[in-house]
Amino acid sequence: MKNLSFINKLIYSANIIFALVLLFSFALPFFPPKTFSILSVLNLGVPFLVLCNVLFFLYWLFQLRKQLILSLLTLCLGYLMFGSIYKFSASKKIESPNNFKVMNFNVRLFNVYDWIPENNIESKIVDFVKTEAPDILSIQEYHPHKNVNLSFFKYKYEHVSGKKIKYGQAIFSKYRIINSGSVEFPNTPNNAIFVDIVKGKDTIRVYNVHLESLRINTRIEVLKTEDSERLLKRAGSTFKMQQLQTELFLEHKKKCKYRVIVCGDFNNTAYSYVYRKIKSDLNDAFKEAGNGFGRTYDFKFFPVRIDFIFADEAFKVNGFKSYNAHLSDHYPIMSTFALDD
């Protein structure tokens, strides 16, 4: 740092801090949240930390300074461990007579509390689903709204609870459902539900997983006034709950004898412990066939992917689409799969 100006020394000092924090974030998915519960919040900030390190790298590159090596090596390590946060390749789209489409969508109770200041959001969601025509629809924060008619799906399983407003999870299917159930999580309305569907000669299990929410208000004026210590403690407690919920789900899943598709809102990113554990040897449909950031949540500061569709290796991932439909605080995603005859 001897040959750096005072300003560049300050910038490089900041560069070191951001690189070290990002490196630490890369290690967190390999440790249970109960070990570093509060620090696990860094998982949510990985896209931001990556962006900062890209900017540092470009800054030093334009000056032809060797300080670029720090962020370059950090970013390369992250790429080797997790892949890129942005997929530059075009979305894969393979047509096949065996194709079927699976959509995941957290509908936020069909806007029953008017979070979005528009009329008929529930009808717009129904119209959107009808237009995109998934064969299987996985919904989190489902509410049996009087104006919601999804009868174009022949089969469904819903699990709802609540006194004043009933809500929960639901799976709709154009294929026959022969079995269904719920994996209950303690002390929360969140859960995981499943259905076994028959498609041709195959029986497929589809899970819909909704892990504990951080309950963070993304409005800037609210975040500015919220106590940071209380926010971190709440996040740490949430990550511990997510770990327990993940363990309960995986215990149920390992008893399944069918090929599996896992959909859900994990309320955590692809750099988290719960993502790594649930994904395990499954394929992330976005990584296989998507493009761009794959944003699934309306966070104001940077693109966040917290909703996922996974499938075991028996399924070919023939397509993936992230939608920019502003009908909830989440964005819908849909994957196209195929099973060989």
What residue spans do the PLM features occupy?
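Short amphipathic alpha-helical segments
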Residues: 149-152, 220, 273-276
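Short, solvent-exposed loop/turn segments at secondary-structure boundaries
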Residues: 113-119, 183-184, 297-300, 323
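N-terminal, active-site-proximal structural segment of metallo-dependent hydrolase catalytic domains
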Residues: 1-150, 247, 340-341
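Metal-dependent phosphoester-hydrolase catalytic domains
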Residues: 8-22, 27-60, 69, 251-260, ...
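Structured beta-strand-rich core segments of catalytic domains in phosphoester-bond hydrolases
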Residues: 75-97, 123-127, 135-217, 321-325
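Active-site beta-strand/loop signature of hydrolases that rely on acidic residues for catalysis
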Residues: 101-107, 121-147, 195, 205-209, ...
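Acidic/histidine-rich helix-loop elements
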Residues: 104-120, 215-238
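Active-site environment of divalent metal-dependent phosphoester hydrolases
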Residues: 109-113, 143-147, 163-166, 189, ...
